[in-house]
Design a protein with these regions (language model features):
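Extended, charge-enriched "interface" segments that sit outside catalytic cores
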Residues: 35-38, 48-124
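Charged, compositionally biased N-terminal leader segments and the immediate start
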Residues: 4-18
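Duplex nucleic acid-engaging cores and interfaces of nucleic-acid transaction enzymes
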Residues: 99-116, 120-196
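Conserved small/polar residues in nucleotide/adenosyl-binding loops
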Residues: 30, 47, 197-199
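N-terminal amphipathic/basic-hydrophobic helices that include classical n-h-c signal peptides
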Residues: 1-2, 199
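Secondary-structure capping and boundary motifs in well-ordered enzyme cores
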Residues: 19-23, 43, 51, 81-88, ...
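N-terminal amphipathic, basic-rich helices that act as targeting or association modules
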Residues: 17-25, 31-39, 43-46
Length: 199
């Protein structure tokens, strides 16, 4: 029945919507909650986290499937939007880029409000000497033992990188030789560390 409807030249696709683009609009509404002044500030951070995690899953599952379909080159069209997989990917990219930009702006806004309440993210250069010392001890005890640096080369081709694992890329120089390395940060390593000196 649906195939017959697709073949009908009079079918108006403006009454239906691509599932992926519809989902992105839903996730945008989640993001907009983080920009509401009447929402408690830590709840706004939570909405930012939910929005970002949702997009991670979206790219892993839905975009991955559409990309695989695009490699088949059979001109299959979506039954709701009449878009090919390539066209869907283009539309997704057009919608996602502004969302990430908006996410970053909202995060900067929330971070400033937190800083006004004496809650702020600090770079290593901003720490006091005693804080740096305690942080170094924490790093050597809790982080360094679980790191596994990899230098990419002929003997070590680029490895499979698991989803949702933070990877740090490094350009390594030794005399005239330049190489590339990566360090994966395991999920159980804390991304944020409270200033131990003030606890």
């Amino acid at each position: 029945m649906m195939e017959g409807r697709m073949m009908n030249k009079n079918y108006d696709f403006s009454y239906t919507q691509d599932r992926e683009l519809s989902w992105l609009k839903f996730n945008e509404r989640v993001l907009r909650e983080a920009d509401k002044k009447n929402v408690p500030i830590f709840e706004r951070l939570k909405f930012l986290e939910i929005f970002t995690n949702n997009l991670d899953e979206f790219f892993m599952v839905r975009v991955g499937s559409i990309h695989e379909m695009s490699l088949i080159h059979d001109n299959h069209r979506d039954i709701r939007s009449d878009l090919t997989p390539e066209e869907q990917l283009d539309e997704i990219a057009k919608h996602v880029r502004p969302l990430y930009e908006l996410r970053d702006k909202i995060f900067a806004k929330v971070s400033k409000e937190l800083a006004d309440k004496k809650i702020k993210r600090c770079q290593i250069e901003e720490l006091e000497k005693e804080e740096k010392k305690k942080l170094k001890t924490y790093y050597e005890a809790m982080i360094l033992p679980v790191l596994s640096p990899i230098v990419i080369g002929k003997q070590h081709p680029f490895p499979h990188i698991p989803n949702k694992i933070l990877q740090i890329g490094l350009i390594l120089k030794k005399k005239e030789k330049i190489s590339f390395g990566i360090i994966g940060l395991p999920k159980d390593v804390e991304r944020m560390i409270l200033s131990l000196i003030h606890i």
